């Protein structure tokens, strides 16, 4: 192919081979061009013109707008390779060299408008050694680096769901061998698949890459001893980032183990069913628990809240520490308001540190860092006079080294800083001895021009003579065409206009050379000083990241205190008991959607020695689903260290939450609604423990009545009597037959959603009371839904016949079908 192409297209072909499955943007002058299939992709996704040259499809984008176009492509899951042309300022002859200098993928964003402010942007790598799976996870924009190891695909998949990465890395053999796993991840996540060489996933290569990156000779200090699959995944991910994407890795934090035992586990189905991060029928998180709880003021605090929401604590100490801090700020309202004001001025310290580490920082970024650090100093000062809870003790103290940095940035930088280093005006005059001298020359040039203009007006007698500046011409003298013959011979013609002539002089040309030289010297000097400043800031990087963690923790607990104050939340007692007792509990999301005082609170009392299963009956629309979801949400909030919407609560720590609520067909897997329901229920039966909380809504409804009832009762009995599986369970059902279990098992208690009748019409009270429901009121709900009245009337007739002695109603004669 290359023999038939021009030299430039041969160069493109070489770059395309290196780019692999990336879309190649090839720099040609002031445009980035795409050719062949890439041109079609570019035109289709960016709505730009597709053209042809010598029968080669091509499309292009202006170099000045590259970042915006790249963001649009990456947001659609494309991987981009950028081929830049070498500097040809010296005017060398021949083809300008071009090489790929960066690759951009959805999971490897250092700085982009696509980065969510209050969420991480993860890329993960997975390796396999025998039956073990290694997982590594990176957020390049913050430097966060996590590793984990799993002995089954279920736990691996759930971990990936919780991390919600935008890109998955492995090698071809893994993808072939684990196709069902990969398809499942693609089905539930918007994730781009990437491949890397298989040898990078081998232990020797992986450890060497980790040693080099972190300047160590052993990984034992990171707690990775024996975790071969995790090490393989981590090393391969670093290799991919550095060697293939050509991105820096020196700013990464040391790898931390992403451990299951530290958190309350909430699987993907439960996250969705409970609408933790986004509402099932909402947009952009509206109607979710996250939307209700989001009161954070900083990007770091927002990310911490989001991560904790899907990974609540299982360690009682961690929960109590945060509860104490929330209580402290709840009582200290003036301090809380003051700190929130300061926190709102703190920018993303993690990502600013990454930008500086990777030489992507602009002067404006350094200004944001300076202002953020000043706000942190104000926070530390405001906290000094208080006796802080243990969680915050010493957290907001700023070291003397960091104080020196803050002082330097405050005194040495100008207040308003430019977006680009080339724009200058970054440092104060006193910062360097040559700055003031060069700036004075530049400033005095304006007065020199005015003086020169006035002098030659006097010498020539032309009062309307002007000295002007244009980018193409530089400085010039302009007079009306009629005055041009009066000018002395030393005036050199530069340009003729319709009614004017433009000239220069030796004196003006000499002045221009001096001014331009000064501007070049100023730009060179400030560029050099800016690089030195970034190096100085990097000496404090670890302190900045430590401060970032502190600010995130502080923002987190203050936001929970704000939430508690706004809705009068109370502190739950969380301990190692097996109690689940909630008085006057309310659904945190529904509470915000209704007028104050209109939500009906309900109690819950469960205890392994007494009631550990509630069978909940009642008609649709009476509040059953809201109630059982409410219990799960309150447990999650409590184990986040948050206060909850309840008068009081006693919650023994829960290890896992499972939900089986609603379903739809899974066409991509060839699974019916009932099959999805059974698969989710099977997962619960296999993985629930005595310390789990299980929420079941209408299990068994997707098949015949007796089949469904049999399945439902078998599930109930399994969770009641199987050792190690005796989870606290709330089971909402329409099967009245199940309520008889209360007579035979002391651990089962019937409750129902209260409905009163008024003139034969049901009135939903949204109260949960002891006992089982007597009626379902399904026909009434059908009427409310808009059923034709004739259908409603016929349904009532059939219901009366079912409830009478003859349990097999005959079809109306007019409706009987003639079968033969």
Swiss-Prot record:
Key word ATP-binding present: yes
GO cellular component: cytosol
GO BP annotations, alphabetical order: mismatch repair
Positions with a binding annotation for ATP: 618-625
PROSITE patterns in UniProt: DNA_MISMATCH_REPAIR_2
Pfam families the record matches: MutS_I (PF01624), MutS_II (PF05188), MutS_III (PF05192), MutS_IV (PF05190), MutS_V (PF00488)
GO terms, molecular function: ATP binding; ATP-dependent DNA damage sensor activity; damaged DNA binding; mismatched DNA binding
Function: This protein is involved in the repair of mismatches in DNA. It is possible that it carries out the mismatch recognition step. This protein has a weak ATPase activity.
Protein name, entry field: DNA mismatch repair protein MutS
Highest classification ranks of the organism: Bacteria, Pseudomonadati, Chlamydiota, Chlamydiia, Chlamydiales
